[in-house]
Amino acid sequence: MDTLIWNDLRHHARQWLWSLLVATVGGAIIGVIITAWYSALSWAQAQGSAELINAAHIIGSSLVSYAGLATAVILSTTLGLTVSAQQRSHALWKVLGIPGSRIRRIILAQVGVIGLLGGVMGAVTSLPLVRVYLLTWREFDVFPQNLPIIMPGFGVPLTIAVTMLFCVLGAMGPARRAASVPEMQALREATAPQTRTRWWQWVVVGIMLLGLVMTPFESSLPMSDAERAEMATSGMNLNDPGERAMAGASMGLLAAIAALSVPNWTLRPLLTWWTALIPGRSPAWFAARANARHRASLSMTTIVPFAIAVALTGTVYAAVGAGQATGAQGSVSGFLSVGVPTFFISGVGGIANIAMVGRARRQEGALLGVIGARTRTVLASTALEGVIYAVTGILFGLAATAFSAVYAALYSGGGTAVLVASVPVGLLVLVSGISLALAVATTWLPAQLD
């Protein structure tokens, strides 16, 4: 079994190396979050200030909520894609007589090795990276620029454990499928593995939707004296239009998380819908659209990083714009502290996910050449497939931003003024352009590596 694990890792080295890159970056971000939070908390405790301690906890929890969640999603989806892309090999194992239970153990062991190596390298690289990352904290004006960096004793093992956990969780579904699907069916579906939405994904959606529904009613419920005192201490007042606008706009992020939890019901219909609006007269466009739809389960994973990057930018800045339009003293202070690691893992994840299916894309390009397609058509089809992935993620992010703007306008009662102020057009154009450029460039990268 050990021999098969290592031989298969070498045989599919290109795919596993991309996964290792994502796991290393994810581990580095996890290590940076742990070290930065612990360093800020240690310094605040040394100052003996309850305000500084509270600020450290707020920043740390925000990092976990935004950057940590994005890292978890991208790590798990990337490793799931890696396993799904090797479905043909797993089917051949079953043909050779290897039991399904052993195949599942082998796959999870391989993913565990990648998570372990990524966690170790991420923990090591997080130490020099945390000093660079803390430059984004200067906008807080709370902690010193030369904040002492302290990695706790549990930092390295926790980084490794969390990285491995996210990797293994993402691979459990594809590994279970590889062990249970009949080998002939798996061989037929090797280029386009089928996926299904599981019960726990709907549980996540239900929790997120409950938050969306309950938010408008919370401010109308009577509060006790203790609750009023706590809100006054924190500076929050949900009866203030500015606070209501910012709270309403932040609901877009909950909606985005809920939608990304069930990509088969959100991203797949979105991809099918908007690509159907463009006529398929061009052979390059027709081939790119057909490939993206045919590999829908793999395409969903590729779209997720771009969707996260655009949705995070849109919803956060929508909350700030809505608050400022209603008189709240909000700013984007602290956005870089969560935005930089999120954009970093999103970019690396997007590049890796597109590159990992490059072999299948090149095989399809070769088939197009056999039936008479020109080289220019094949290359255009490859680039257009990257465009489809990026545009689908961009449209998802724009939809999340629009949801935030509408929710803020309705919840605050600010109307059109809040709606217009909630849409950060310039930043959305910038992030969308970067996502599009990355996707198009990465579709060419695997061909250059051959």
Predicted features and spans:
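Selective transmembrane-helix segments that form parts of the transport pathway or gating/packing helices
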Residues: 16-20, 71, 107-127, 164, ...
